[in-house]
Structure formats: C-alpha cells, structure tokens
A protein has these predicted regions:
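Contiguous, well-folded functional domains in the mature portion of proteins
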Residues: 1-247
Length: 247
C-alpha cells in the first residue's frame, strides 16, 4: 500500500496541529474523566485527519499529443462558462471558465497548457464567498498569463474565498509552463478562473465536476499561419512620347 503524499504547503501546519492536539489531550488524560478524554481524543483525531486529507497531493500524470487541449487547472465544479469582459489584462471580451473548489477538493493547481509565463501578479482584496460572481474582481487573487508556442495567450486567476486566506503561486514571469506541473496552491475553499479566446471549443458545461490535471476542458482553435503578403505587381512607369513637330 502506497503512503499518501502530503503537499509541501501543508507539512508545517500538520506538524503544528499534532503539537497542539498533544497539548490538549495530555491534560485531558491526566485531569479529566476517561469519557471526556475519549471524546476529546476522537474529535481531535478527526481534526487531524481532515487537515491531512485537505493537503493530500495525488500523483496525476496526463499524456496527450495535442498541444491545444486545455486541462482542468483544479478539482471542483464548473460554475461559469460564458463570454465576459476581462478588465485586468486583456481589456476585451474573453471566454471565462470558472471552477469552484470546496474544502474537500484537492487544492493544488496545475498548468492547463504548455507555454511561457508572461505575467504573474498578486492583488489584495476581500474574502467573500468564492462562488459569488464578484469574487473574480473583488477578492484577493493572483493572475498568471501563459503564452502558448502558437502565440495564443490565456489567463489563469487564483481567487481566495471566505475560508481561503492564502494563495500560493509558483509561476513566475519567464518560467516555462509544463503539463503535469503545479502552478500553485490555494488553502481551503476557493475558485480558479480561466480566460480563453472566444473561439475555444469547450467540452464541459456548468454543473459538471472536473479533476485537476485529468479532465480535458476544451481545445484552443488551430492558429493558421499568416499568408505571405502578395508581391505587388510592378507596373512599368508610363512615359510620355514626345510628338515630333512638323517643320
């Protein structure tokens, strides 16, 4: 049986939780009735299981040949698939795809496509419910823009929720985005938005549950190579014929 993997973002918190529970349970065992100690031990054990489960880090490797496929960057439920105005980077209409992550989902975030990271910015904000539409623009968030080898740009926005108080983004400008690699991590319930070209072909609908680095969300349209400019036909300059004067 394989030992469960724990994400590096949770190791310090798990150690702190174990120490805290030890400090709670030892006095309960010494100074309180056995039934009170048993209840406390059971409750604190459940808390430790939840914290450990929350920071689980499953191994997911997806092998696909088509570089235009978009892979889910996070676990959760699709809550938005619609054209919308993106005001922070593109300043134009894009196809927004949003995934809501509950506290029971894996909270690691993956790169949805391969390319080069152009932008990685963190913005402070509120901590409203991540399921609310305004959370995309008002909550604490991090924006990552990736340019594919075919020069198509997409944006991934990590959004903090009412419980999620910390966003971790590993992507930095100039980094190469590889499939099967973590883009970042969000602690507790949160949301991930993607902004895609309007002609992106989508394979999922609102209400569907997806798995990060497993579910194929859609496919970017093929980018046609620009046609070579037609050479302008050179026209011979017109010359005026000198009329011979009659003598």
């Amino acid at each position: 049986m394989k030992r469960p993997r724990i994400h590096r973002e949770g190791r310090g918190l798990i150690v702190s939780t174990v120490l805290l529970l030890f400090m709670i349970n030892v006095p309960m065992y010494i100074y309180f009735p056995h039934w009170a100690f048993a209840v406390t031990l059971a409750l604190t054990a459940l808390l430790l299981v939840f914290v450990t489960y929350f920071f689980r880090n499953p191994v997911r490797v997806l092998e696909i040949d088509d570089p235009n496929f978009l892979i889910a960057p996070a676990d959760g439920r699709v809550v938005v698939v619609e054209p919308t105005e993106e005001h922070e980077y593109f300043h134009e209409k894009k196809l927004q795809v949003s995934i809501f992550m509950s506290p029971f989902n894996v909270h690691a975030n993956w790169y949805p496509i391969e390319g080069t990271v152009l932008v990685s910015e963190h913005q402070k904000g509120h901590h409203k419910g991540a399921w609310l539409p305004k959370s995309s623009t008002e909550n604490e968030r991090s924006l990552v823009v990736i340019e594919t080898p075919s020069k198509v740009q997409i944006a991934v926005r990590q959004i903090a929720g009412a419980m999620a108080r910390r966003i971790v983004t590993y992507a930095k400008p100039g980094h190469v985005a590889h499939r099967n690699t973590h883009l970042g991590f969000i602690k507790l319930g949160s949301r991930v938005d993607m902004y895609l070209p309007l002609d992106t072909e989508m394979f999922v609908q609102v209400g569907e549950h997806v798995k990060g680095n497993e579910t194929i969300l859609g496919r970017l349209a093929d980018v046609k190579a620009p046609k070579p400019a037609k050479a302008a036909k050179e026209k011979a300059p017109k010359t005026k014929k000198n009329k011979e004067k009659k003598v």
